[in-house]
Curated annotation (Swiss-Prot):
Pathway: Pyrimidine metabolism; UMP biosynthesis via de novo pathway; orotate from (S)-dihydroorotate (quinone route): step 1/1. GO terms for cellular component: cytoplasm; plasma membrane. FMN binds at residues 62-66, 86, 139, 172, 217, 245, 268, 297, 318-319. Monomer. This is Dihydroorotate dehydrogenase (quinone). The lineage of its organism: Bacteria, Pseudomonadati, Pseudomonadota, Gammaproteobacteria, Vibrionales. GO terms for biological process: 'de novo' pyrimidine nucleobase biosynthetic process; 'de novo' UMP biosynthetic process. Catalyzes the conversion of dihydroorotate to orotate with quinone as electron acceptor. PANTHER family: DIHYDROOROTATE DEHYDROGENASE (QUINONE), MITOCHONDRIAL (PTHR48109:SF4), DIHYDROOROTATE DEHYDROGENASE (QUINONE), MITOCHONDRIAL-RELATED (PTHR48109). Gene3D superfamilies: Aldolase class I (3.20.20.70). InterPro entries: Aldolase_TIM (IPR013785), DHO_dehydrogenase (IPR050074), Dihydroorotate_DH_1_2 (IPR012135), Dihydroorotate_DH_2 (IPR005719), Dihydroorotate_DH_cat (IPR005720), Dihydroorotate_DH_CS (IPR001295). The gene is pyrD. Belongs to the dihydroorotate dehydrogenase family. Type 2 subfamily.
Length: 336
């Protein structure tokens, strides 16, 4: 009820202004009596995945807390894991505004943010100060002005800086809002990137005395053959997990709706079915060789269960959280 009232107010604002205000309020309320608006005690539903123990299988997807400013607040909401980022080596402003749009009747969002963030060093400082009990994932990407042929270097820089502080590292090569980025999902480019990341992981594991798993985040806009090739690369390079999926460029199910024509990636309920199909295809290809984190339209217990039945061990929410609030996390965890 409280969130429904808050949402009514937030939805009167421009989508990005509402997002920024929510982040500021989470920072302001954290550790004060006002955090009772979102703090919740949830039952333990432990899951072993990628060598880590998650207190429950429901996580916050990357993109909501790009700079790691609200880890403690999201931890207080009961998430089993929180993924911050996407973060890049250098700060960058992202794409021109407006760049975030609600498709309310479809419970969807279109964004063309463009990896706006304050840089990896800023994020690391925030992570070092935060106190939390959930697993922390850090999602890494490349700067817009880094040529795609040099993209691996950006991922390696970020990986080196976040390794010591991450529970796992998510490698984002599937955002549609950085020109050329999705080309890293294919063929030799993917193999070379994963090989370099794996070598860096071994080097950092020895240096820090701990193994931090790597998960690759992929797009929903892939053919079955492309998914099969990605799976071959994941297995060949001993990657620890795969996150499926990012946002879609497809507008078929929202055609004619307000804002549906806007450029960018579409998330929420409109991508639910396709992302679940990608999870199912990944599971058919991978079996138990590596775990799948399912994300895309997880807006209810039923949607979460469908992802798990398709083969996901963990699920993440983002757009569903915008529309339904912390109660969504509670409903999924309690019904598992």
């Amino acid at each position: 009820m409280l969130y429904r009232l808050a949402r009514t107010g937030f939805f009167q604002l421009d989508a990005e202004k509402a997002h920024d205000l929510a982040i500021k309020n989470f920072q302001r309320f954290n550790g004060t009596p006002l955090d009772l608006f979102y703090r919740q005690q949830l039952p333990n539903r432990p899951v072993e995945c990628m060598g880590l123990t998650f207190r429950n299988p429901v996580g916050l997807a990357a993109g909501l807390d790009k700079n790691g400013e609200c880890i403690e607040a999201f931890d207080a909401m009961g998430f089993g894991f929180v993924e911050v980022g996407t973060v890049t080596p250098r700060p960058q402003p992202g794409n021109d505004k407006p760049r975030l749009f609600r498709l309310v009747e479809a419970e969807g969002i279109i964004n063309r943010m463009g990896f706006n963030n304050l840089g990896v060093d800023h994020l690391v400082e925030n992570v070092k100060k935060a106190k939390y009990n959930c697993v922390l994932g850090i999602n890494i990407g490349k700067n817009k002005d880094t040529p795609i042929e040099n993209g691996a270097e950006d991922y390696l820089i970020c990986m080196e800086k976040v390794y010591e502080y991450a529970g796992y590292i998510a490698v984002n090569i599937s955002s549609p809002n950085t020109p050329g980025l999705r080309s890293l999902q294919y063929g030799e480019a993917l193999d070379e990137l994963l090989s370099e990341l794996k070598a860096k992981q071994a080097e950092l594991a020895e240096k820090h005395g701990k193994y931090v798993p790597l998960a690759l985040k992929i797009a929903p806009d892939l053919s079955d053959d492309e998914i099969s090739q990605i799976c071959e690369s994941l297995i060949k390079n001993n990657i620890d997990g795969v996150i499926a999926t990012n946002t879609t460029l497809d507008r078929t199910v929202v055609e004619g709706m307000k804002h549906a024509h806007e450029a960018g990636g579409l998330s929420g309920r409109p991508v639910q079915s396709r992302s679940t199909e990608v999870v199912r295809k990944l599971h058919q290809e991978l079996g138990d060789k590596l775990p799948i984190i399912g994300v895309g339209g997880v807006d209810s217990y039923v949607a979460a269960k469908e992802k798990m039945m398709a083969g996901a061990q963990l699920v993440q929410v983002y757009t569903g959280f915008i529309y339904h609030g912390p109660g969504l996390v509670r409903d999924i965890v309690k019904n598992l």
